Amino acid sequence: MIVRWLGAAATAVLLAGCGTPPALASPPEGLVLRLDEYHGPVAVPGRVELPRYALYGDGTLVAAVPGPVLTARVYHLTPGAVTRLYQRALVAGLGTPRRIDADGVLDASVWVVTVGRMTGPARTTIAAPDPTAGDQGGSAARGADLDPGSLGDRDLTAPPASYEPTRYAVIAAATSAPATRGWPLRPLTPGVEVFDAECEVYAAADIAKLGPLPEAGSVWSTGGQSYRVLVRPMLPDERDCAELNRYLP
C-alpha cells in the first residue's frame, strides 16, 4: 500500500538522524512531489506553464517537454524509485513549508516545490535555485531537482510515452494584438481568474477540433476581442482552473 511504503521511507530518514521533521506520507495515488519553475520577476498574464515534473504515489511521473507547445511525457516509476525521490526531498527539508530567498539577487528565477503529506501539501519557494550551491537553498534545490532522462531501466515499469490528457485548461489574456483566427469552441470568457487571465476547462475531444495544439501565446478572437491563448494539459490531480493558482510563487 502506498501509504505504508512512503511512511516507511519517512521513518528511515528519521532513524538515520538526518534531522528532518516528522513527515507524513501522501495518500494513495496522490501527489508526492512537484516542481514548478518561474523565470524573472514579471510574469506574463496567463502564462501558466506545466510543472517541470509532477510525481504521484502510483508511480506516475508527468514531465514537461520544452517547446512552444505545452506537451509532456509520462513515466511509470517503481515503488522503490518513488520512495527514493520522496526520501531525498525529506532529507532536504522539503517536508516543511518555507521560503528561501536569495540576498542581493535581482530578476531571479523561482522554484515552487510541493511535497504531498497526509495533512496537506508542504510548499517551499526557492529564489535563484542552484543545486550546486552549498547553502540551504542549494540543499533544497538538490532535493527537488530531477531530470527524468536520468532514470534508469530499473526505476521504470514501462517505457516513457507521450502524456495524453483527458482535459485541457485554456487560459486567455486580453490583448490589443491582431488575431490570426477566430476561436471555434465555446467562448473563452468569462472564466476563472488565473494569473491575471481567465481560464476554462475543455475536454480533450473539443481541443482536438483545433487541429494541432497551438503554440502558447497564439492570438485568437472571440466576441470582438483578441486574446493570447495558452492551451495547457491538465495533470491527473488538477480538478479545475482554480487548482492552477495553488502553485504560483
Feature locations, PLM:
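Charged, amphipathic alpha-helical segments
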Residues: 81-102
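Residue-level marker of positions within ordered structural domains that often coincide
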Residues: 60, 90, 118
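Bacterial N-terminal signal peptides that target proteins for export
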Residues: 1-7
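Short, well-ordered, aromatic-rich surface patches in folded extracellular/luminal domains
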Residues: 19-39, 95-249
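Extracytoplasmic low-complexity, Pro/Thr/Ser/Ala/Gly-rich segments
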Residues: 21-81, 161-163
